[in-house]
Amino acid sequence: MALDIHAHRILILDFGSQYTQLIARRVREIGVYCELHPFDMDDEAIREFNPRGIILAGGPESVHEANSPRAPQAVFDLNVPLLGICYGMQTMAEQLGGKVEGSDLREFGYARVDVVGKSRLLDGIEDHVDGDGVLGLDVWMSHGDKVTQMPGNFNILASTPSCPIAGMFDDARGYYGVQFHPEVTHTKQGGRILSRFVQDICGCEALWTPSNIVEDAIAQVRQQVGSANVLLGLSGGVDSSVVAALLHRAIGDQLTCVFVDNGLLRLHEGDQVMAMFKENMGVKVIRADAEKQFLDNLEGEADPEKKRKIIGRTFIDVFDAEASKLDNIQFLAQGTIYPDVIESAGAKSGKAHVIKSHHNVGGLPEEMNLKLVEPLRELFKDEVRKIGLELGLPYDMVYRHPFPGPGLGVRILGEVKKEYADILRRADHIFIEELRKADWYHKTSQAFVVFQPVKSVGVVGDGRRYAWVVALRAVETVDFMTARWAHLPYDLLETVSGRIINEIDGISRVTYDVSSKPPATIEWE
């Protein structure tokens, strides 16, 4: 009988915290499957999900305000272990008969909590011990309210001077609440705390591993697709590359990929994609050389959003044209990943603040009467990368820096021209090459060059040169929501600048972008 890697599962209910997806990623890193659902998930759905444990995540609301969110009753009726984090602890306390009040002293940022009670959750977990033998944890707090009275049968787990009940527990039921955030890296022992809850208290085994995920995905694809043929738009990005490798292993020649070369890719990227998938792996790949079509459609357009829409529409036109030449295609594969699924669900429920639109396939499924196959839809981005390595894709491909869907089209400020794209891709190649040589590529989260359509005077030999300006951009970030500019060594910047100006005709000046996000975005357009 095949291993059911979803058998041991954790349910995470989202009350609106910015950290909720991070909780899910931490649970997955432990090797346990989990799903994230809105706080108002109905009782029947919770019972059908049949979790081994439930985590109530944080949120921005106050439990003593009217209409603030509450956990469904099924959470308490299932008799499974429960962990409330921040707001999750507060609503658990209030719903079970305790009291929550606003605090005069809010806690935001680093804090030290004293471990007061002896519980299964924190037994043997500490950062330091003071002279009186009191155990302490270094944690990350983010709360304005606090529990002032615990429900019956609960004991104090942890405390701070301004928040005497910074944690509470009922070992008999496996109910725990912590006012701090174990999911963030600032809480040093957070990983151990979550592992203790998920594995030891909930009894979940580590079945969610890259090798098991690959085997399960292959079995699911074969069951869904059977002997039918599948079409995939291959971009060379991480998600579509992993889908291609996974589907090829699962169904072989039943997969056909269409690679649209829009003339806005990185240096040699089209050839590299073809070499990797067609020549090395034997995947059926059709290369559509559409540079002229994209550049013609972009001619005269300088507005960033309009450029994006033109590139998106042109991609669909080219992809449609290639797909219409193929016979007997029943399925369209997509690189949908779990955050896309979460956002879509949030959009439908009206709870999402940000809605991402995916234009990569347009109306193709409906027009061609195709069914969707989405083998990555349960996975976070970091899991997709691990799956890529498990499937044998090169590390440098799997851990390549993000590249925008419109490509160089949004790294050329203003109108896009072939001359600009050719200059930019060479400059970008030099920057990335030198980052790799200096062992800085993987220390940065994203690095690239921006073409600015302004000219600056320069001196070459005995003559003056009036040529274009480019900007180097390199950032460090954990989640791409915030980012700081990378403090690259001056000698590295000097080497990059010297090579770009000396090796590329048409560039007279190189600048370095020292803007962080916020207020600046990572990309310039």
From Swiss-Prot:
Q: Which reaction does it catalyse?
A: XMP + L-glutamine + ATP + H2O = GMP + L-glutamate + AMP + diphosphate + 2 H(+)
**Residue pairs linked by disulfide bridges in the UniProt entry:** none
Q: In which pathway does it act?
A: Purine metabolism; GMP biosynthesis; GMP from XMP (L-Gln route): step 1/1
Report the residue ranges that make up the Glutamine amidotransferase type-1 domain in this protein: 9-207
Tell me which residues bind ATP.
S235, G236, G237, V238, D239, S240, S241
List its EC numbers: 6.3.5.2
Superkingdom assignment:
Bacteria
The EC category is ligase
Q: Which UniProt keywords apply?
A: ATP-binding, Glutamine amidotransferase, GMP biosynthesis, Ligase, Nucleotide-binding, Purine biosynthesis
An example molecular function term from Gene Ontology annotations = ATP binding
Q: Which residues form the GMPS ATP-PPase domain?
A: 208-400
What's in the GO CC field?
cytosol
Fetch the CDD domains from UniProt. Answer: GATase1_GMP_Synthase, GMP_synthase_C
Pfam families in the record, alphabetically? GATase, GMP_synt_C, NAD_synthase
Q: Where is the active site?
A: C86, H181, E183
Q: What's the subunit arrangement here?
A: Homodimer.
List the PANTHER family hit by this protein, alphabetically. Answer: GMP SYNTHASE [GLUTAMINE-HYDROLYZING], GMP SYNTHASE-RELATED
Task: Kindly give the HAMAP family that the UniProt entry links to this protein.
Answer: GMP_synthase
Q: Summarize the protein's role.
A: Catalyzes the synthesis of GMP from XMP.
Q: What is this protein called in UniProt?
A: GMP synthase [glutamine-hydrolyzing]
Q: Which organism is it from?
A: Pseudomonas putida (strain W619)
Q: Identify the coding gene.
A: guaA
